[in-house]
Amino acid sequence: MLKNIQCKIKEGYLIFSWKPFRKFRIPTKVKGKLMQVRFVPKSGYYTMEIVYQINAPEITIESKNIVGIDIGIDNFATISNNIGTTPIIINGRIVKSFNQYYNKKKAELQADLKVRHKMDWSKRLQRLTDKRNNKISNFLHNASKTIIDWCVFYGIDTIIIGKNDNWKQESKMSKKVNQNFIQIPHALFIDKLKYKAENKGIKVICTEESYTSGTSFLDSELPIKENYNKGRRIKRGLFKSNTGKLINADLNGAYQIIKKVFPNVFTNGIEGAGSHPIRLNII
């Protein structure tokens, strides 16, 4: 670890006064006050982390413009709101494809290793794992940045995230379970959302999401046990209200997540709430 007396940022470059590193000039977009530079060991290499301090805006106390986020797999993040603008869905199928390819390739390589060398792991497997992890990390960064940029554009002051300790796994157990049973670091995604939101003065609230998937937003139901009926969630990811209206099932859950924390936020009616989300593909 190098303290800020051993390095500095000047004209868009990280410069080192520490003798072994003096020849290096590393371009950076860091704008805040440099605190330290640390080198974190990984599998066969190191990553450099720049720790810096910025003056974050004060987080608002009152919640007026609110979004709710339902986290899943195919629909990685479904974002509802109470301001009447079109909701959005972050497509998660690309992450699913990362894991399917990784699980398949990993199984093939491990099978070959066991037969040929009586081994379970190799440098090639480590490279495959690192590549998968880097792709997912990049996706989480871009997805969280997209959401925060959207919130800033629409003047959102509060984000409510539905949290489930077991996280939904939509894949069905079958002979392809190793390709389809997906492990996505949702907690890391929430952490990225939190610090990006904090830097913009946006409040983040995590709430448990019980009864949000089986209660009806379109029928103005509260997400409580007495209203729970998951039988209204029909095929193709749709939720059917008591009056026969259809809404994206995850979007219904995202609206109900808002009502978990602010049950009266839609007291002026739900007519202005969007029921047809836009799907975004994050690269």
PLM region descriptions:
Residues 2, 32-34, 43, 64-66, ...:
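Short beta-strand-initiation
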Residues 42-190, 267-283:
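Substrate-contacting helices/loops that form the catalytic groove of nucleic-acid
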Residues 5-7, 11-17, 75-82, 236-242:
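Short polybasic amphipathic segments
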Residues 31-51, 220:
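An anion-binding catalytic pocket shared by soluble metabolic enzymes
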Residues 1-40, 183:
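Acidic carboxylate diad motif detector
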Residues 178-283:
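Positively charged, low-complexity nucleic-acid-binding target-recognition regions
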Residues 21, 53-55, 74, 84, ...:
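Short, glycine-/Ser/Thr-/acidic-enriched flexible segments
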Residues 17-32, 60-62, 85-93, 247-251:
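Short amphipathic beta-strand/extended segments with alternating polar/hydrophobic composition
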